[in-house]
From Swiss-Prot:
Record-given protein name: Large ribosomal subunit protein uL10
Keyword rRNA-binding in annotation: yes
Source organism (scientific name): Bifidobacterium longum (strain NCC 2705)
NCBIfam families referenced in this protein's UniProt entry, alphabetically: PRK00099.1-1 (NF000955)
Listed GO biological process terms: translation
Domain of life: Bacteria
Length: 173
C-alpha cells in the first residue's frame, strides 16, 4: 500500500473512531466469510465491522483522541465501530463469540475508557439504555402511587379518628 492510500485509510478510520459511541476489538482468525456476514447482520445498520492494518488503526485511534489501544491492536484484529446503543452491540458480540469460538474479544473503548478483554465482556452484562429507562419510569410510577396512597391515607385516618371520638362521646353521654 502506497503512502497516499495509507493516509486515506487513516483519515477514514479516524473519522470512524470519532463518530463511534464505542469500539470493540476482536480477533477474527478462523471465522468464515458467511460467519462474518452473519455477525455484521446481527450487529445491525448502525455498526460497522472492519479489518484494518493495526499500524494504521493505532495512528487513527490516536488522531481521534483514543489512547491505550496499542496493546490490544496486535495480531489479526477486526474493529467494530458502534453508533448508538453500545451495550446491545456488546451483547451481540459476546453471544456470537460463545457460539463461534474463533471470534475472540480483545478489548473495547467506550465513553472515553479503554477496556481489556474482561472489561469488554463485562460491558455486555450491563443493562441497555431502554432497560434502564423502563426501570426508572417504573420506579417513578411506583413512588407516585405510594405518595398518592399516603396522601389519601392521612385524611381517611383523621376522619376515622374523629368518628371514633364522636362515637365514644355519644356512648359516654
Amino acid at each position: 500500500m502506497k503512502r497516499p492510500e495509507k493516509e486515506a485509510v487513516v483519515a477514514q478510520l479516524t473519522e470512524e473512531f470519532r463518530n463511534a459511541d464505542a469500539v470493540y476489538l476482536t480477533e477474527y482468525r478462523g471465522l468464515t466469510v458467511p460467519q462474518i456476514s452473519d455477525l455484521r447482520e446481527k450487529l445491525g445498520r448502525d455498526t460497522s465491522y472492519t479489518v484494518a492494518k493495526n499500524t494504521l488503526a493505532r495512528i487513527a485511534a490516536k488522531e481521534a483522541g483514543i489512547e491505550g489501544l496499542d496493546e490490544i491492536l496486535s495480531g489479526p484484529t477486526a474493529i467494530t465501530f458502534v453508533k448508538g446503543d453500545f451495550i446491545e452491540a456488546a451483547k451481540v458480540i459476546r453471544d456470537f463469540a460463545k457460539d463461534n469460538k474463533a471470534l475472540v474479544i480483545k478489548g473495547a473503548a467506550a465513553d472515553g475508557t479503554v477496556y481489556d478483554a474482561e472489561g469488554a465482556k463485562k460491558l455486555a452484562d450491563l443493562k441497555s439504555r431502554p432497560q434502564l429507562l423502563a426501570e426508572f419510569a417504573g420506579d417513578i410510577k411506583a413512588s407516585m402511587a405510594k405518595a398518592a396512597y399516603l396522601f389519601n391515607a392521612l385524611p381517611t385516618k383523621a376522619v376515622r379518628t374523629i368518628d371514633a371520638l364522636r362515637e365514644k362521646q355519644e356512648k359516654a353521654a
